[in-house]
């Protein structure tokens, strides 16, 4: 199965089809949503969307790695990463799709 990449534009168009709002208005809502989630994660907060998943930021500990080019050992400082944990409902929907169960009617 070939992977298809969907962009912000696809999301905006799909939402326009779902609701009776202009493309410009929906684009502003999508941008605002991304800004709100980003700001919350920057403050170390967790964002939970029921039946979709949880966004959170975590601190990854400092570690030691190896340069692929030179083989030299390098230290990797601790840093924040964004983690998304899908809900059971989302996992189940994707699992069904990937195994060919969806649309098999």
From Swiss-Prot:
Q: Looking at the record's lineage, which domain of life comes first?
A: Bacteria
InterPro entries according to UniProt:
Hist_DNA-bd (IPR000119), IHF-like_DNA-bd_dom_sf (IPR010992)
* Gene3D superfamilies linked: IHF-like DNA-binding proteins
In its keyword annotation, does this UniProt entry include Magnesium?
Answer: no
Q: What does the record list as GO biological process?
A: chromosome condensation
Molecular function (Gene Ontology), one example: DNA binding
Keywords from the UniProt entry: DNA condensation, DNA-binding
A GO CC term attached to the entry: cytosol
PANTHER family linked: DNA-BINDING PROTEIN HU, INTEGRATION HOST FACTOR SUBUNIT ALPHA
Family from the record: Belongs to the bacterial histone-like protein family.
The function of this protein is:
Histone-like DNA-binding protein which is capable of wrapping DNA to stabilize it, and thus to prevent its denaturation under extreme environmental conditions.
According to UniProt, the name of this protein is DNA-binding protein HU
Task: Give the species this sequence originates from.
Answer: Treponema pallidum (strain Nichols)
Kindly list the organism's lineage. Answer: Bacteria, Pseudomonadati, Spirochaetota, Spirochaetia, Spirochaetales
């Amino acid at each position: 199965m070939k992977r298809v990449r969907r962009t912000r534009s696809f999301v905006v168009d799909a939402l326009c089809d779902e609701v009776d709002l202009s493309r410009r208005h929906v684009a502003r809502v999508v941008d605002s949503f991304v800004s709100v989630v980003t700001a919350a994660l920057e403050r170390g907060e967790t964002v939970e969307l029921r039946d979709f998943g949880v966004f959170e930021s975590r601190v990854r500990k400092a570690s030691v790695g190896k340069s692929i080019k030179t083989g030299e050992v390098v230290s990797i400082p601790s840093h924040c990463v964004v983690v998304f944990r899908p809900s059971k409902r989302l996992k189940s929907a994707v699992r069904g799709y990937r195994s060919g169960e969806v649309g098999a009617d």
